[in-house]
């Protein structure tokens, strides 16, 4: 079958920042090659005199979009003037208004359904709104075809209501109240492989969801909902999304209906049948939005720290932060009397790094939350952010030492999260060697280590309370095993200590590697001093 992979860019509200958008597109295309089209959801035009002046440059031909660009219609009365034809028209060279509602099918066979505007309950609706009649008309025009299986892409400016049901947490609590029930119904029926929306100023990439009932209906393709932030936003939230797609009509059915590991139930199924909403959403603090491709603009910000005179670090001029507390004794809660503070290397706002007791290597360290969290999937977004900062700092540090690190977590028979970070000499083995060794040794013990999909995250795969073992390689590749019954407690260390990697099998059990208190203090000081130039908590 003559499959042709299309390369598509999508962006959120432009608000008249045309130069910012198109300059960004030029940079992307210079770095990653040409894309076939740019799809813009949300408000393309701004309302300020300055944005009108910028638009006149494109309208006159003085400036030109570097890619074929398709936009949706107005979302307010002020910008209605730009859209002369409700059925769509060319606005400027390389910039096309799709229309109020309809289906756009290119020569490639890619099917793009679209609905402009915001929801209105009144008739007649303003020119920048859609009504239930518009949604019904669009649905019927497509679904009346007996061969209809869904569309490749759905573009709406507004969010669908209840999109986070069964899914990952929304970026903020306010987002729960937004959205159109009509768009939820439209998405439920059109079954888009990708659904893009904007207007809320947020980047939210929902887990893929099913379009069929398991064991009751034939398998169908999954849908992905993605909201993008506004172009050039000051918070550096992601506003461009890049993806490859082969039109549904040219895709083998077996490939089309493959279900990813992190797929969820359909968020609209209950609302479509007018039944009560699901209450299965996690709180907004439970998850941080997943970043994909090369458009993550977030940069960690360091803070100046001062020493407490005991080797630890304290935050300057900050109110004490409230962290979750254990119900009983815990060896790893920083405020606990049981914690061995002489092993602490660095302390942030939410996490700390400590030398591993009985480490595989002298620079084997742990990343731990200050508060009492059992696993990665329990972490709040603030803690996740700082964990990522520590991971990045350690990665850079070990690279200067000619090493790569392997990180693993065992959420089984443990009450406090410990991210084990073990550096390995580059000359010792390749990343692929490490990956293969983990998989093979898991198989030898009757376990299956699954590779987590490239753009997925462990919080999308395991619910809080789920026992699991997780590995992250320096390449970003991730392996996951859901623990059902028994699990060897030293498995991560056993793999790394094995002949295939470090060849130090006698150090597989930490209890066989314990040092004296004085030796531990020396090792900790040595590591702390070496790591200091890379410790973001010490930076201005």
Curated annotation (Swiss-Prot):
Residues 267-277 have a biased composition (Basic and acidic residues). GO terms for cellular component: post-mRNA release spliceosomal complex. Residues 265-326 are annotated as: Disordered. It comes from Xenopus laevis (African clawed frog). It comes from the Eukaryota. GO terms for molecular function: RNA lariat debranching enzyme activator activity. Belongs to the CWF19 family. Coiled coil: none annotated. GO terms for biological process: mRNA splicing, via spliceosome. This is CWF19-like protein 1. InterPro entries: Cwf19-like (IPR040194), Cwf19-like_C_dom-1 (IPR006768), Cwf19-like_C_dom-2 (IPR006767), HIT-like_sf (IPR036265). The gene is cwf19l1. Gene3D superfamilies: HIT-like.
